């Protein structure tokens, strides 16, 4: 058993280091004799510790248990009241505490003042501006660092340097925290007024960020960056991240391309040895110099010096240091402003009449035409999704807030809730449900607001609109997205592509006679100037579309959509300011509508087209590509002469002048070699991603448990690591120990072992080996997996009560009735389950389930009870396959150049040997014929799990399933009687397995699984025609080979001799695989 259990045991000795502390390991085994020894061992340990005897003798006596059984958990207890943090901290608090400069930030409350100065009384106090929003505490974080430091104080050589660097930085944190005392968190991991009143307001979030940074220090450069950010972020809570990361938008334009990858006709990345020189006008250097001066003004010294040293020769070899600075800047934590300031920010912009009306007209027309183009086909053909738009909206209604708390009755139970789904049910039950009337959002009914916080930018506000807006927009937006899916211009939505494809698109046309224009339009999206032309363009488009059909229901759908736009042109918002709620007329576009992403993309495409059409009057060029990706847009322009400094300068100034004529406050840049947008940046022909995910501070609180957050923490660590920001793995593991431990009583705690946290069960939190997803196949692993499956889903009394009420039942049956033309249990049960699952976002229900889960878990971690189950997991399948494979050594040469320099070496090696992929593997069954058939006639979207169930039914059951969803009998018959149906069986099984094996997550998403280089390492003689079996054998083999290579940096080849007799058995088993949802899979999904 791995490193985790070792560290766990050391950690417990470190934390509970008093005389009265005891650690009792609990073992289990799938072998019944050994299991009995485990039980004996455990009861004797308890006996001895009750009588205050040593456990040493038992460890010898039961060495068979310790050697052969598997560690399940460690029970630890200590009668010491645990103020150990303060005591240990003193040892490190030898430095000079930081003093906050209280004049750095423009807004008074962003200065790191003593809390009672910002909030004189407990009533005025709010933690919302500094809440770390994570279910772990500052004291735990301090403990984790001190544990690491104590464990490594005797390191030698290079490791000693790392120790010294971290110790030095921790001294700053420890001294500052110690000066005021460690803030004690409450049961909800929040910091109350009483605790904070005599301490600096931002102390906790600053200390968390600082710990995250110092535990990510390895090299001397890391140390310099971290030190500077830690010291300055103590005072500067507003602009630091922005200052440090601003230069990147120019740096990418300075590096020559010497060999790069481009997208070829087959949408694959292909190496091109082209050389493109960076042409940089003096003006650009002046702007860069200005940015660096601004950094110095803010007190930065080392970081600007690093940038200036790099500027001497602008080499791609040293560029990773620039990438590192850019990533690190985000780790200073979130900027959390007051709602009032966030809202006023958009309204501060001076509204001028002095704009180019002609350009606005063009912009509006382009939006109109694009909306028409997107919806023309579905409208002309009276698409059923547009006819049944209301039902489609209800089926995908989220359980987010509807903006106000209401009292709702479900049967005899009365509850208060803000959730949309509950409001809809309640309104239907009480005859208040009127989706045909879109409520106004004017001065009489202003919009409540949510918030979005992000490091390095100001807080943005989010509209929380009534659910009628969602229902009105859902179907139309879905149709827009379908159009965007097969339109290359929409980089974000383009069919199954990933960011590597977009990278190859840009580099493809870069040459000595081309330049690329890239613009960050986030300011424009939320500006007042955008709102009228934007909404009007959409309205005009909808008007034109309404004339293309005679179907009353389609016209109604378009009209309701139009009404949402009309209402939003006169929007007011409500902002709590102290005790009063202010109403403000808000004339800008904010997120919160269903259309936000799609409509912004349309508008940004229209914007760049407008600008290009203007500058084409002055310059002659061909537009090779136009792309829009979220808040950014970029275009590659090809000229008929070689690009010169003067040309770049002229185009740049013309572009800026053009934007200015629309009064668009955007950051537009022109370069010949690279771009920088929010999602990715390209420099020297290589692609980089910002590794800026915060680990110890979260944006907001949700209703996830500590286990969920531990999994998210690990997942964030992995993503950062792939992007070039590595945090010490021991530290991450220590955090996982802290966050997954379960308190039994005040002095008694249970710490699950590595086996519990890494086996793919409903409790999985992390992988024992980074980047490698293991599916345990040993007896003990399968045993524990079975044990956990027995307690996977927990009941909730409140949820059952709500689900039994007539309000709920009538709602579900109403949906079923509208959807189905005949009885269909699978779908009806599916809808009921989905609706019931949506109730989980109601806190009392999730709390109730959590409590049940914890108590079941506690029992299980002390003695696993396995159960005989007909359920088969992917582990069972792999366990059957494994014995038939034989391994031999192999050799694969490195044959591809690096194009993603930030990748860890072991992952990079694999891409260099087998190549990368530019597409997502389809894992939701949407490409199957049955899925397409259903979406042709029904608004219902079955999940991959449901398709997997359905496709394995008898043919007549499949027919009934289809007919009940409104598919004509003739189509259903044709489907079942055709070859397509048997292809579907295979295709859906394939999708389902890909889905189970997380093939589109982690680093697996980077590898080309169909690489001929990988294929040639696998030999599986072809026996009998069962494609599904050959598929699973190949996939298993590929994962084995890749996992081995990640771990060992060398290749193996696999030979499989699978007996024909076993094939049919395996094939039958493959139709019974259960999917396991765990905090780990949720965290992966959350990354999306």
Swiss-Prot record:
It is an enzyme of class 2 (transferase). Belongs to the reoviridae RNA-directed RNA polymerase family. It catalyses: RNA(n) + a ribonucleoside 5'-triphosphate = RNA(n+1) + diphosphate. It is found in: Virion. This is RNA-directed RNA polymerase. Its cofactor is Mg(2+). Keywords: Magnesium, Nucleotide-binding, Nucleotidyltransferase, RNA-binding, RNA-directed RNA polymerase, Transferase, Viral RNA replication, Virion. InterPro entries: DNA/RNA_pol_sf (IPR043502), RNA-dir_pol_4-hel_dom (IPR042032), RNA-dir_pol_luteovirus (IPR001795), RNA-dir_pol_reovirus (IPR007097), Rotavirus_VP1_C (IPR022071). One of its GO terms (cellular component) is virion component.
């Amino acid at each position: 058993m791995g490193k985790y259990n070792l560290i766990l045991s050391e950690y417990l000795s470190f934390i509970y280091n008093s005389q009265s502390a005891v650690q009792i390991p609990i073992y289990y085994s799938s072998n019944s004799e050994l299991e009995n020894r485990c039980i004996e061992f455990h009861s004797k340990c308890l006996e001895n510790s009750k009588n205050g005897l040593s456990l040493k003798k038992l460890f010898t006596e039961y060495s068979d248990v310790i050697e052969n059984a598997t560690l399940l958990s460690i029970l630890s207890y200590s009668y010491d009241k645990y103020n150990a943090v303060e005591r240990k901290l003193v040892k490190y608090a030898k430095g000079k505490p930081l003093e906050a400069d209280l004049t750095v930030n423009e807004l008074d409350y962003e200065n790191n003042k003593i809390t009672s100065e910002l909030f004189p009384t407990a009533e005025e106090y709010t933690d919302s501006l500094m809440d770390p929003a994570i279910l772990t505490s500052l004291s735990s974080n301090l403990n984790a660092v001190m544990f690491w430091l104590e464990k490594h104080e005797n390191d030698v050589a290079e490791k000693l340097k790392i120790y010294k660097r971290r110790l030095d930085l921790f001294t700053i944190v420890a001294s500052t925290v110690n000066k005021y005392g460690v803030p004690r968190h409450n049961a909800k991991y929040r910091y109350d007024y009483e605790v904070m009143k005599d301490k600096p307001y931002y102390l906790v979030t600053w200390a968390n960020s600082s710990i995250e940074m110092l535990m990510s220090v390895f090299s001397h450069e890391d140390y310099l960056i971290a030190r500077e950010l830690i010291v300055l972020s103590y005072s500067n809570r507003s602009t630091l991240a922005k200052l440090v990361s601003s230069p990147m938008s120019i740096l990418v334009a300075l590096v020559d391309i010497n060999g790069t990858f481009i997208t070829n006709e087959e949408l694959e990345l292909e190496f091109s040895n082209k050389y493109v020189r960076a042409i940089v006008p003096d003006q650009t250097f002046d702007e860069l110099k200005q940015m660096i001066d601004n950094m110095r003004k803010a007190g930065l010294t080392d970081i600007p010096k690093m940038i200036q040293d790099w500027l001497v020769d602008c080499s791609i070899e040293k560029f990773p240091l620039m990438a590192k600075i850019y990533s690190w800047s985000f780790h200073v934590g979130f900027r959390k402003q007051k709602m009032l300031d966030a809202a006023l920010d958009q309204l501060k912009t001076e509204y001028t009449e002095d704009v180019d009306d002609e350009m606005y007209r063009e912009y509006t027309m382009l939006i109109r035409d694009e909306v028409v183009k997107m919806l023309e086909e579905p409208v002309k053909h009276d698409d059923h999704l547009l006819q049944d738009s209301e039902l489609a909206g209800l089926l995908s209604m989220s359980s987010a807030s509807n903006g106000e708390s209401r009292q709702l009755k479900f049967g005899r139970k009365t509850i208060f809730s803000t959730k949309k789904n509950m409001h809809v049910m309640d309104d239907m039950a009480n005859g208040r449900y009127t989706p045909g009337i879109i409520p106004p959002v004017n001065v009489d009914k202003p919009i409540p607001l949510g918030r979005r916080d992000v490091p390095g930018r100001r807080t943005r506000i989010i509209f929380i609109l009534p659910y009628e807006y969602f229902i009105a927009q859902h179907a139309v937006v879905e149709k827009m997205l379908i159009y965007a899916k097969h339109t290359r211009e929409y980089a974000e939505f383009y069919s199954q592509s990933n960011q590597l494809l977009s990278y190859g698109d840009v580099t493809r046309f870069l040459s000595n006679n081309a330049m690329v224009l890239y613009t960050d339009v986030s300011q424009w999206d939320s500006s007042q100037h955008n709102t009228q032309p934007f909404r009007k363009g959409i309205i005009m488009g909808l008007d034109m579309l309404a004339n293309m059909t005679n179907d009353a229901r389609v016209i109604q759908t378009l009209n309701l959509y139009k009404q949402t736009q009309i209402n939003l042109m006169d929007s007011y918002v409500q902002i709590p300011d102290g005790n009063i709620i202010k109403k403000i007329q808000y004339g800008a576009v904010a997120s919160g509508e269903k259309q936000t992403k799609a409509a912004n993309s349309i508008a940004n495409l229209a914007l760049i087209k407008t600008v290009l059409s203007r500058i084409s009057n002055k310059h002659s060029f061909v537009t090779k590509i136009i792309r829009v990706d979220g808040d950014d847009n970029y275009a590659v322009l090809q000229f008929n002469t070689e690009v010169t400094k003067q040309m770049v300068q002229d185009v740049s100034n013309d572009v800026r002048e053009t934007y200015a004529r629309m009064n668009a406050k955007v950051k537009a840049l022109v370069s010949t070699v690279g771009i920088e947008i929010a999602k990715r940046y390209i420099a020297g022909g290589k692609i980089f991603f910002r590794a800026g995910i915060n680990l110890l501070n979260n944006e907001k609180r949700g209703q996830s448990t500590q286990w969920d957050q531990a999994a998210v923490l690990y997942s964030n660590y992995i993503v950062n690591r792939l992007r070039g920001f590595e945090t010490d793995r021991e530290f991450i593991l220590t955090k996982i120990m802290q966050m997954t431990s379960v308190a039994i009583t005040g002095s008694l705690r249970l710490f699950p072992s590595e086996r519990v946290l890494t086996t793919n069960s409903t409790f999985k939190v992390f992988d024992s080996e980074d980047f490698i997803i293991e599916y345990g196949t040993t007896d003990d692993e399968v045993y524990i997996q079975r044990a956990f499956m027995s307690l996977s889903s927990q009941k909730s009394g409140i949820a059952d009560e709500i689900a039994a009420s007539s309000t709920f039942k009538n709602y579900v049956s109403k949906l079923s009735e509208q959807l189905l033309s005949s009885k269909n249990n699978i779908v009806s049960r599916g809808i009921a389950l989905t609706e019931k699952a949506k109730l989980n976002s109601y806190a009392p229900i999730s709390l109730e389930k959590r409590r049940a889960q914890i108590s079941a878990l506690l029992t299980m971690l002390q003695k696993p009870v396995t159960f005989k189950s007909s359920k088969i997991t992917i582990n069972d399948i792999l366990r059957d396959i494994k014995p038939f494979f034989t391994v031999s050594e192999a050799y694969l040469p490195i044959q591809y150049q690096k194009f993603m320099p930030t990748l860890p070496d072991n992952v990079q090696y694999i891409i260099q040997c087998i190549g990368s992929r530019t597409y997502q593997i389809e894992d939701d069954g949407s490409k199957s014929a049955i899925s397409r058939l259903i979406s042709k006639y029904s608004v219902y979207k079955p999940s991959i799990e449901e398709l997997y169930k359905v496709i394995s039914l008898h043919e007549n059951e499949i027919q009934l399933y289809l007919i009940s969803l409104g598919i004509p009998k003739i189509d259903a018959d044709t489907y079942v009687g055709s070859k397509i149906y048997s292809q579907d069986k295979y295709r859906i099984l394939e999708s389902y397995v890909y889905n189970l094996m997380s093939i589109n997550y982690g680093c697996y998403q980077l590898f080309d699984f169909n690489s001929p280089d990988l294929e040639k390492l696998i030999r599986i003689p072809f026996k009998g025609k069962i494609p599904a079996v050959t598929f699973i054998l190949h996939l298993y083999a590929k994962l084995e080979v890749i996992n081995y290579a990640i771990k060992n940096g060398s290749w193996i080849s696999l030979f499989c001799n699978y007996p024909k007799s076993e094939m049919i058995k395996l094939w039958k088993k493959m139709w019974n695989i259960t999917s396991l949802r765990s905090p780990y899979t949720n965290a992966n999904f959350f990354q999306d």
